UniProtKB/Swiss-Prot annotation:
Gene: TGG5
Full protein name: Myrosinase 5
Annotated glycan sites: N46, N53, N222, N428, N489
Covalent S-S links between cysteines: C31-C450, C39-C445, C230-C233
Misc: It seems that the absence of a catalytic proton donor in plant myrosinases is not impairing the hydrolysis of glucosinolates.
Source species of the chain: Arabidopsis thaliana (Mouse-ear cress)
Enzyme class: hydrolase
Length: 511
């Protein structure tokens, strides 16, 4: 998960975890017109109100849980060791949850939670140390993922596999700049085909990319993620051009991989393939201001439409073309046809909604400010939703974005591939406090309530994955944020304990 730090300008969040106002309104399980902001009865709410074939799962990613043992370096390894000051606790994921050694324990946690599915990712450099097929396949890495997938299947848990979750092999960064170069499209497609060949007999759900926006903006817009490039960054960069190049190349890699899967593997393997986008909703700061209404629409187009428009319509949003000009790459007619419709399903990661207000043009081109929008979580000092120690979350936005996608993007088959909230842990949180995470129960319960409402509205949603199965290394925040439904001791990762939220989710699914 990527914490929604300021992409434009945001209010600073320093309040305590979950402050709930009874005057605020959102969906409840009955989906009435006016409902309390929190779940009235978390014990009574359960999965019985969802379709029988609806999938519930939990999610993680390779870099955040596996540890670095027995794999080649990726961009995050290099970045966190070269620039430890970029992470609040100066940490890396060298050990993390040690899931490379403890994957059977991971599956036990999943089994205890009663989930039907597990969203995981493959570490590119664990199976292809040089990043490309010509550099050789690491059969030990293949064996690791075979063992994990087999363990999941043996326990009745369906694997949903993310092919790329921001961990570019460092060899490809060194050789040609990773996703800055079109050369990565072929290497990525070959890597994906290797996964189809080795795991496709058991994996029936493939996710090509995780939040391509985050890699583009944070890796190349402000340099807070690897490879740490931006205008004025030590490693160089151009914040007004490179994010658009990287986004474009990710879309091409996705589209060519989907085309390959459909032509060579889908018919006899019987799987589906899609991608996961960030799902953020935007509310006009002044609901009566036409400028703010337009700003909220622009924010959506620059955050979500940037990727969803090409995937559904084969072209970038018109407003982006008008405002970004020739800095925004063009699809050739052949590329447009390839990208258009390259989704069997849409994955959506939803965490927050924000207020949007019109902003003046930036002083210099930058993909982070090109939309000319100022974003925040507060209106006249009042938060948009529930104030947590990590961010402010707004469950009604969940329903609103799903309905907007239904109405404007042909109502695609959708899986909620991430949703959750973090607790801040600066080393001063007792174990008892960490395990009593009632705020997380409210977060999941309220979002599931709004999801149920959205489905009654006709939104084509087929699954929900909680982020996260367990506490892990949070990109850009190290170990200072804990998203897990299970607690992990990061000095001894075999020490895991079920949180109150994990117990709640297990009971929610058992009913």
């Amino acid at each position: 998960m990527a914490i929604p730090k300021a992409h434009y300008s945001l209010a600073v969040l320093v309040l305590l975890f979950v402050v709930v106002s009874s005057s605020q309104k959102v969906c409840n399980p009955e989906c009435k017109a006016k409902e309390p902001f929190h779940c009235d009865n978390t014990h009574a709410f359960n999965r019985s109100g969802f379709p029988k074939n609806f999938t519930f799962g939990a999610a993680t990613s390779a870099y955040q849980i596996e540890g670095a043992a027995h794999r080649a370096l990726n961009g995050w390894d290099y970045f966190t060791h070269r620039y430890p000051e970029k992470v609040p606790d100066r940490s890396s994921a060298d050990l993390a949850c040690d899931s490379y050694d403890l994957y059977k324990d991971d599956v036990k946690l999943l089994k205890r939670m009663n989930v039907q599915a597990y969203r995981l990712s493959i570490a590119w450099s664990r199976v292809l140390p040089k990043g490309r097929l010509t550099g050789g396949v690491d059969e030990n890495g293949i064996t690791y993922y075979n063992n994990l997938i087999n363990e999941l299947k043996a326990n009745g848990i369906e694997p949903y596999v993310t092919i790329f979750h921001w961990d570019v092999p460092q060899t490809l960064e060194d050789e040609y700049g990773g996703f800055l170069s079109t050369r990565i499209v072929e290497d990525y497609t070959n890597y994906a085909e290797l996964l189809f060949q080795r795991f496709g007999d058991r994996v029936k759900f493939w996710i090509t990319l995780n939040q391509p926006l985050s890699l583009a903006l944070k890796g190349y817009g402000n340099g807070s993620y690897p490879p740490g490039r931006c205008t004025g960054c030590e490693l160089g960069g151009d914040s007004g051009v490179e994010p658009y190049t990287v986004a474009h190349n990710q879309l091409l890699a996705h589209a060519k991989t989907v085309s390959l899967y459909r032509k060579r593997y889908q018919k006899f393997q019987g799987g589906k393939i899609g991608t996961t986008l960030i799902g953020r909703w935007f509310v006009p700061l002044n609901e009566f201001s036409e400028l703010d209404k337009a700003a909220a629409k622009r924010a959506f187009d620059f955050f979500v439409g940037w990727f969803l428009d090409p995937l559904v319509y084969g072209k970038y949003p018109t407003i982006m073309r008008e405002m970004v000009g020739d800095r925004l790459p063009e699809f050739t007619p052949e590329e447009s046809a390839l990208v258009k419709g390259s989704l069997d399903f849409l994955g959506l990661n939803y965490y927050v909604s924000q207020y949007a207000t019109d902003a003046p043009p930036p002083t210099q081109p930058n993909a982070i400010t090109d939309a000319r929008v100022t974003l925040g979580f507060y209106r006249n000092g009042s938060p948009i939703g529930v104030v947590a120690s990590s961010f402010v979350y707004y469950p009604p936005g969940f329903r609103q974005i799903l309905n907007y996608i239904k109405d404007n993007y042909k109502n695609p088959l959708t899986y909620i591939t991430e949703n959750g909230v973090a607790d801040l842990d600066l080393g001063n949180v007792t174990l008892a406090t960490a395990l009593a995470d009632n705020g997380r129960i409210q977060n999941h319960c309220s979002h599931l309530s709004c999801l149920k409402c959205a489905m009654k509205d006709g939104c084509n949603v087929a699954g929900y994955f909680a982020w996260s199965l367990m506490d892990n290394y949070e990109f850009g925040n190290g170990y200072t944020l804990r998203f897990g439904m299970n607690w992990v001791n990061f000095t001894n990762p075999a020490d895991r304990k079920e949180k109150a939220s994990g117990k709640w989710f297990s009971k929610f699914l058992a009913k």
